[in-house]
């Protein structure tokens, strides 16, 4: 089986624009933090 270049995860971040990566990081950190998640329900789905 041959997988695409980003399928191993090493290059996945390189394919994301920096602001998107920052937003994703903030969202992940916030959504794992109950007070932040409760204060920002729109970003955690």
UniProtKB/Swiss-Prot annotation:
Origin: domain of life: Eukaryota
Keywords attached to this entry: Acetylcholine receptor inhibiting toxin, Amidation, Disulfide bond, Ion channel impairing toxin, Neurotoxin, Postsynaptic neurotoxin, Secreted, Toxin
InterPro entries per record: Conotoxin_a-typ
Disulfide bonds: 30-36, 31-44
Region annotation (Lacks the Ser-Xaa-Pro motif that is crucial for potent interaction with nAChR) ranges: 32-34
Main location: secreted
Modified residues (Cysteine amide): 44
Maturation propeptide residues: 1-27
One GO cellular component, as annotated: extracellular region
Subcellular location: Secreted
Tissue expr: Expressed by the venom duct.
GO molecular-function terms, A-Z: acetylcholine receptor inhibitor activity; ion channel regulator activity; toxin activity
Entry note about domains: The cysteine framework is I (CC-C-C). Alpha4/7 pattern.
Family: Belongs to the conotoxin A superfamily.
Function in brief: Alpha-conotoxins act on postsynaptic membranes, they bind to the nicotinic acetylcholine receptors (nAChR) and thus inhibit them. Has possibly a distinct nAChR binding mode from other alpha-conotoxins, due to a different three residue motif (lacks the Ser-Xaa-Pro motif).
Protein's recorded name: Alpha-conotoxin-like Lp1.10
Organism: Conus leopardus (Leopard cone)
């Amino acid at each position: 089986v041959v997988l695409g270049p980003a399928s191993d995860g090493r290059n996945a971040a390189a394919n994301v624009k920096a602001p998107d990566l920052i937003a994703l990081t903030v969202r992940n950190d916030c959504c794992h933090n109950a007070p932040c998640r409760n204060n920002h329900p729109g970003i955690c789905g």
